[in-house]
């Protein structure tokens, strides 16, 4: 209701019209503003998009953190696994090297080995021209000791054949020093056997085997031959003495070849060799115990 002042001045209430580009169209059917509804819808969409984007970014950050922590946890395991493989490989290589340096079997009498090794160290150096050095002789010694302890039938045969006691002679006799020309095979067996541990050698043959090992005369690379004083210094006497020396050398050499070839066949074929002076039962026992046959040099 208009007051008196308005009635006096004739005041008339009116609306200010905006330009068309700024005018707001009304939706008479819905009784609302179309632009306002659209703006609200856009704001809702933007708000929803922002919320979804935030959730997505949070999820990505969470997954990244989770993956990083998993890698951190798995990294020590991978490093430990690689270290284990590397260490295992190193141990295997070291084991191969140690096996290559070790002997094929262990010496049962370790005290005898230590004593004999100390005795060997105190001995003078071997003569020049030998096929084996000191280290190789030590290896051969332990191998032949094992054969002596485990296979007694060849015990006396080897010791009688290769010990250092040469021909027994009287003090009044004069000697002729003669070098025997051994082959490399004979010298190799001689060197292998002369280093045998004397403390483990039995001087009595096994009674189960009816073999006379003493018929093989002992010898070394240097043989002392007795000079018969009754033989004159004439050419005939020298000839007879030379024939005697040659006969003894040939006899010893043939015995060496007989034994070494027999042992070689046993090592290679593992079959009894009757022509080598070894019985069938003895040959089968010998083939069970590797000795010098295991050496690569032979």
Swiss-Prot record:
It comes from the Eukaryota. GO terms for cellular component: cytoplasm; nucleolus; RNA N6-methyladenosine methyltransferase complex. Induction: During sporulation. Expression is activated by IME1 during meiosis. One of its GO terms (biological process) is negative regulation of pseudohyphal growth. Disruption phenotype: Impairs sporulation. This is Sporulation-specific with a leucine zipper motif protein 1. The keyword Cytoplasm applies. Its main location: cytoplasm. Residues 37-61, 69-91 have a biased composition (Basic and acidic residues). Belongs to the ZC3H13 family. Component of the MIS (mRNA N6-methyladenosine (m6A) methylation) complex, at least composed of IME4, KAR4, MUM2, SLZ1, and VIR1. Interacts with VIR1. Keywords: Cytoplasm, Meiosis, Nucleus, Sporulation. Residues 18-91, 109-128 are annotated as: Disordered. The keyword ATP-binding does not apply. Component of the MIS complex, a complex that mediates N6-methyladenosine (m6A) methylation of meiotic mRNAs and is required for initiation of meiosis, progression through the meiotic divisions and sporulation. In the complex, mediates the entry of the MIS complex in nucleolus, where methylation takes place. It is found in: Cytoplasm; Nucleus, Nucleolus.
């Amino acid at each position: 209701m208009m007051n008196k002042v308005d009635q006096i001045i004739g005041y008339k209430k009116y609306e200010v019209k905006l330009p068309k580009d700024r005018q707001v169209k009304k939706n008479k059917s819905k009784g609302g503003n179309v632009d306002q509804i659209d703006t609200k819808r856009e704001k809702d969409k933007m708000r929803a998009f922002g919320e979804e984007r935030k959730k997505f970014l949070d999820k990505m950050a969470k997954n990244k953190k989770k993956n990083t922590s998993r890698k951190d946890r798995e990294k020590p395991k991978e490093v430990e696994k690689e270290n284990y493989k590397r260490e295992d490989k190193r141990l295997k290589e070291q084991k191969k090297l140690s096996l290559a340096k070790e002997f094929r079997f262990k010496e049962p009498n370790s005290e005898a080995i230590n004593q004999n090794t100390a005795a060997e160290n105190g001995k003078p150096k071997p003569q020049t021209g030998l096929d084996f050095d000191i280290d190789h002789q030590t290896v051969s010694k332990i191998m032949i000791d094992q054969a002596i302890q485990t296979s007694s039938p060849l015990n006396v045969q080897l010791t009688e054949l290769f010990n250092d006691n040469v021909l027994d002679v009287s003090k009044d006799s004069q000697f002729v020093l003669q070098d025997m020309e051994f082959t490399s095979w004979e010298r190799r067996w001689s060197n292998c056997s002369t280093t045998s541990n004397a403390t483990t050698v039995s001087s009595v043959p096994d009674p189960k085997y009816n073999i006379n090992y003493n018929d093989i005369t002992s010898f070394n690379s240097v043989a002392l031959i007795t000079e018969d004083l009754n033989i004159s210094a004439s050419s005939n006497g020298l000839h007879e003495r030379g024939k005697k020396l040659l006969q003894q050398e040939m006899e010893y050499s043939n015995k060496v070849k007989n034994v070494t070839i027999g042992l070689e066949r046993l090592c290679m074929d593992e079959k009894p060799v009757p022509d080598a002076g070894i019985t069938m039962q003895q040959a089968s026992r010998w083939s069970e115990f590797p000795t010098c046959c295991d050496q690569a040099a032979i």
